[in-house]
Amino acid sequence: MPINCKSQCGNRAALKRPKTGDALCKECFFAAFEAEIHHTISSSNLFRRGEKVAVAASGGKDSTVLAHVLKLLNERHNYGLELVLLSIDEGITGYRDDSLETVKQNRDDYQMPLKILSYEELYGWTMDRIVAQIGRSNNCTFCGVFRRQALDRGAKLLGVDSIATGHNADDIAETVLMNVLRGDTARLRRCTSIRTGGGEDTIPRVKPLKYSYEKEIVMYAHYKKLVYFSTECVFAPNAYRGHARAFLKDLEKVRPSVIMDIIYSGEQLRFKDTVKKPERGICTRCGFVSSQQPCKACVLLEGLNRGLPKLGIGKKSKGERMIAKQDQELALRERANLVKNDF
């Protein structure tokens, strides 16, 4: 038997919202989805009139829906924002090269300027080459660190006031779980924040989709017929996040509200004053924000360039010993060559 739309618009329901369980027609779902994102933006004061905002664009469902909705809300509610697309090319054959074509389609569809930065031009490496050297066990560590800094570099280059990322409610709940399981209190403090950074030397990042369910983002993109890239990264199956995602899906089967429950729990967490907060400063090598000297990106890059790919994996003291050992070996070789040349 057909079900009427719960909003009493007179139309038949076309879907059931995963977040609320409401039976809605497509138009009422669009209106509710967009209104919730507008409420998130306005209640959290994410933007100010006249600001230039970079939308972190990957071509996937989240960034595509984010670009579409931000453009729509910017016009509907007169935010007064200048929107641009910022995309990072990690150099993953068969994945990123294809998804960038979707990003270019987004550029044309939404009439937004697009800037693409590659790992190759920023670091002299592609993820394909990195994985060839390190294998698949820690590749997501390299990619995540380089990608975060690449977005900062791109944002600085574009002169934007903030970066809008497509992190959704599922992503944030997964991150809370990951940080709890790893005992990472530093990241646990800030992983539910809708705005991060924004100090004197940093460009803030905002998450307009923080309370949007992944399933609803997919439904919105589907019913709106948005063009997006849906293939998973070829290196992602071994990522630690995948285990947190699987665990979250299992929890959701027995408690449908678990995603929002975890986010709200993360927001309410308090730490003792005795728990030390990592101090964020500026990397003395690259000049970008870091909680260590040198920053993680510079340490990982040094390891790759030295042929010590595991330099930035694990404890800092271990990395320092690896550098000292290699420097000692190089010094011994140079000394041996000098002695040889003397004869």
UniProtKB/Swiss-Prot annotation:
Organism, scientific name: Drosophila erecta
Pathway assigned to this chain's UniProt record: tRNA modification; 5-methoxycarbonylmethyl-2-thiouridine-tRNA biosynthesis
E.C. no: 2.7.7.-
Locations listed in the record: Cytoplasm
InterPro entries the record matches: CTU1-like_ATP-bd (IPR056369), CTU1_C (IPR032442), Ncs6/Tuc1/Ctu1 (IPR000541), Rossmann-like_a/b/a_fold (IPR014729), TilS/TtcA_N (IPR011063), tRNA_thiolation_TtcA_Ctu1 (IPR035107), UPF0021_CS (IPR020554)
Gene Ontology CC terms, in alphabetical order: cytosol; cytosolic tRNA wobble base thiouridylase complex; mitochondrion
Record's function text: Plays a central role in 2-thiolation of mcm(5)S(2)U at tRNA wobble positions of tRNA(Lys), tRNA(Glu) and tRNA(Gln). Directly binds tRNAs and probably acts by catalyzing adenylation of tRNAs, an intermediate required for 2-thiolation. It is unclear whether it acts as a sulfurtransferase that transfers sulfur from thiocarboxylated URM1 onto the uridine of tRNAs at wobble position.
Swiss-Prot/TrEMBL keywords: Cytoplasm, RNA-binding, Transferase, tRNA processing, tRNA-binding
Pfam families, A to Z: ATP_bind_3, zn-ribbon_14
Annotated family: Belongs to the TtcA family. CTU1/NCS6/ATPBD3 subfamily.
Molecular functions (GO terms): nucleotidyltransferase activity; tRNA binding
GO terms for biological process, alphabetical: protein urmylation; tRNA thio-modification; tRNA wobble position uridine thiolation; tRNA wobble uridine modification
Name this polypeptide is given: Cytoplasmic tRNA 2-thiolation protein 1
Main location class: cytoplasm
HAMAP family: CTU1
